[in-house]
Every structure is written in structure tokens, then in C-alpha cells.
Amino acid sequence: MANYFNTLNLRQQLDQLGRCRFMDRNEFATEADYLKGKKVVIVGCGAQGLNQGLNMRDSGLDVSYALRQAAIDEQRQSYKNAKENGFDVGSYEQLIPIADLVVNLTPDKQHSNVVETVMPLMKEGAALGYSHGFNIVEEGMQIRKDITVVMVAPKCPGTEVREEYKRGFGVPTLIAVHPENDPKGDGQEIAKAWAAATGGHRAGVLESSFVAEVKSDLMGEQTILCGMLQAGSIVCYEKMIADGIDAGYAGKLLQYGWETITEALKFGGITHMMDRLSNPAKVKAFELSEELKDLMRPLYNKHMDNIITGHFSSTMMADWANDDVNLLGWREETGETAFENYPVTDVEIPEQEYFDNGILMVAMVRAGVELAFEAMTASGIVEESAYYESLHELPLIANTVARKRLYEMNVVISDTAEYGNYLFANVATPLLREKFMTDVDTDVIGRGLGEVSNQVSNETLIVVNETLRSHPVELVGQELRGYMTDMKRIAVGD
């Protein structure tokens, strides 16, 4: 199979990368009706598989799960997930032939094998659904021409898909139809009904493309969403320990600080996050973030380039073929870092203290979001897609760090995201350690400025505020957040 994106000419590539339209709520007036009375069979019952299935069933759809016979015989976790929630479970041979829509929600590395197995069993004119387009775009999977291929991609982990639905809301979602597989012209109707069945239409749906979803998703998760949190946690912890800050306090400041800081992002963007700082701290965070952007821009652009060309995917798939030797080795190394093993403490850190003593963390967030957004849009990805794959998802990923440090983040994200995270963090960590952290002190990470006055020059503050507010990620973010007025706090235990 050849990389699908690389088979397109330049005009086609740019067209696919630039597909993104915020759909009007009126386009979902019939909600999930198009799929009612039809048989939906989900392959895979992990976090996305189970929670999307629960939502779809509650929306009136006929949902069952097709699992490998071995998973059924051995009653593996996927089987238990489905059966304990009252779903019908059967083998591929039992359920796939009667399915009108087969939804493949298995891990990326299993997609080729799964699709090659189920496709011969699918009835003529059925539809095949994905929630991530890697198999189509990067692996170039060829789907039978009578099959309609669609995507519904919620922009958050599966557990959040369910929780937001239960609140009567939903999560922002991308939908797409594969241009090579829409024989009856009803791909969009299928995708719209599926998205509505998960509740996504209540939070906002972007009509996108398989290409735009994959390229932007890979870029976001490798850099700001995961890689920057991992690299930042490691180097900031090292700095605080080296300068005599208590290990328990240092670890807690980072583990829970990312979540607290990025929650401000979710509600008011970078502007609101920076406004949580005192004026002197805001100016300092701005200066640090400008330095970070200059230092890290080449690394962000390199990752974007490798994603666009397919170099990243081919490298990762080679590791798949080698029994994940690199992935597993990097996972073990991460588990041995000092931050992952800091001693638990019962020290209480008030919310504002995470900002006051985490000025560098704020700077890293601002720099990382803007760099990822800029790299994506410079490559032809439209601003709405770039926003969702950078700023919007960051609080959700930071929440996983708050639960069980980097281990939890890497467990929750896909293997594809985890592999890309390590590629980025393995370069970003020594880069920050050697070229940046030597010039900062614990006044920006761990202790705070300790200023006695909030005074800064008017001219400086005006420049800082105007620069922050005029960045394209802030402008598009303000518009998109307007569609999500019913957001909840994501903090652990809240």
C-alpha cells in the first residue's frame, strides 16, 4: 500500500489539507435519524469504542460489537466492556455481514489487519467508519469501491465523549468522507448522523477531510499536546531539584500545574491564561515564551515536515514491524525519569500559586500552542483545524498527567501519539536542558518572583497584551469557543 497523501498532486494535497467548515446547527436537524433502523457494528471496545457505542445506543441506534473469536473465547477486557454494558457481542463472521455501518475503533496499528479481515465480510453497499484516518491516509488502505468510507473524530479521549453526552452536551468533532469511497453520495449523511449520535453536534462539528484530520492530529499530539508536556515536566523538575526546592512540592507543582494552567486556556485562550499572572509575571512569561519560540521553531517545523511527507509514519510503521522495540524502550526510559518517581506529598498548593510559581510553565504553554498552530497553518491546514489540534485539546491531555503523571498520559493516548511524543520529547528535552534552562532561575519555576509591586511600564504591557490578543490562534479560538458555552471544569475530582 502506498501513502495516499503522497499519491495526490500538489493541488489535491492543498485542497484536502484546507478542508474545514464549521457546520451550522441546522444541518443536524434530523440528528441521528439517518442511521436509525440500521445495524451499526463496532469493531473494538476500548475507550473510544465503548463510549461512542454507549452514546449511539442512547441516541436510539442499534449497536453491537464484533470481536475476534479469541477475545470472546478468552473473555478479554474488550469482551467484558461490551457484555457488562448490555451489548450484543459476536464474532466478525456473525455480525459484519449484517452491518450497514462497520465502525473500526481499534488501535491504529491494528487497522490494516482488521480492515483486510472485515472487508470481505461486508455486504455490498455498506459503510466503513473510522475515528482517525491514519489507515486511509498514511497506510493507503484501498477500500472496496461499493463501500462508503466516513470518519467521525471526537476531539477528546473516549471517557470525555461519554461524560459530556451524559450532561446533555457533547465534544467538538470532525467529520469527513473519503473522496475515493462515496459511491451513493450519502457519506456526509452517514457521518452527520453518527456525529449526532455521539452528541458532537451540540458542541460543534467541523466538516473536514481525512487528510486534514490526520496531518493536524499527528502534529498536535507530537508537539504541544504530549511532547511539550513531557519535556517541560522533565526539565522543570530537574531545575527545581537542582536549586533546592522540595522534591514533593516540585513534582506536585508540575503534575497538577499543567492542568490548572491549561484550564484557564480552555475558557479564555492564551490571553486569559496570561491574565492570571501579575503584570510583572506576565511580562516575564511573555519574554520567556518569545525565547522559547525562537529556540524551538525549527524542531516544530521539522515535525510538521516529517508528518506532511510521510517520513514520520514510515518510521513508526517500521517500529511496528520490529515489535515496537523503540516505543517500548522509550516508554521504559520515561518511567525511570526523576519526575515520574517524585515522592508523594500532602502539601497544599492553592490554585493561584500554580500560576505565580509556574511562570515558566505558562510560557511553555503559550510558546507551544502558538508554534504548533503556526506550523500547521503554514503547511496549508486551516486555522479551525489547527486550533482544535493545539489549544483545545491541551487541557484534556494535561488532565491525564494530573491523574498519574506522564505514565497516565502515555497510557490514555494512542500508540501513534505516544511514539510521536517520544520522538519530540527525546530531542526537546536535551535542547531545553542545554540551551534554555541554564539561563533561568527558580523565580520563574518553583518560587515565584516575590514582587512587592505590580507595576510595569504602560508601553511594555500594551505591547505584550496586543501581541497576545492579535495572534490568529486567539482570534479563531474566541469564535470557536463561542459555540461551546456549556463547558465544564475538567479538574480532577471537580
Curated annotation (Swiss-Prot):
Its cofactor is Mg(2+). SUPFAM superfamilies: 6-phosphogluconate dehydrogenase C-terminal domain-like, NAD(P)-binding Rossmann-fold domains. Residues 14-208 form the KARI N-terminal Rossmann domain. Mg(2+) 2 binds at D217, E389, E393. It is an enzyme of class 1 (oxidoreductase). Pathway: Amino-acid biosynthesis; L-isoleucine biosynthesis; L-isoleucine from 2-oxobutanoate: step 2/4; Amino-acid biosynthesis; L-valine biosynthesis; L-valine from pyruvate: step 2/4. NADP(+) binds at C45, G46, A47, Q48, R68, R76, S78, D108, K109, Q110, G158. GO terms for cellular component: cytosol. The active site is at H132. Residues 209-344, 345-487 form the KARI C-terminal knotted domain. One of its GO terms (molecular function) is ketol-acid reductoisomerase activity. It holds the Pfam family KARI_N. Its EC number is 1.1.1.86. Mg(2+) 1 binds at D217, E221. GO terms for biological process: isoleucine biosynthetic process; L-valine biosynthetic process. PROSITE patterns: KARI_C, KARI_N. Binds 2 magnesium ions per subunit. It catalyses: (2R)-2,3-dihydroxy-3-methylbutanoate + NADP(+) = (2S)-2-acetolactate + NADPH + H(+); (2R,3R)-2,3-dihydroxy-3-methylpentanoate + NADP(+) = (S)-2-ethyl-2-hydroxy-3-oxobutanoate + NADPH + H(+). Involved in the biosynthesis of branched-chain amino acids (BCAA). Catalyzes an alkyl-migration followed by a ketol-acid reduction of (S)-2-acetolactate (S2AL) to yield (R)-2,3-dihydroxy-isovalerate. In the isomerase reaction, S2AL is rearranged via a Mg-dependent methyl migration to produce 3-hydroxy-3-methyl-2-ketobutyrate (HMKB). In the reductase reaction, this 2-ketoacid undergoes a metal-dependent reduction by NADPH to yield (R)-2,3-dihydroxy-isovalerate. This is Ketol-acid reductoisomerase (NADP(+)). It comes from Photobacterium profundum (strain SS9).
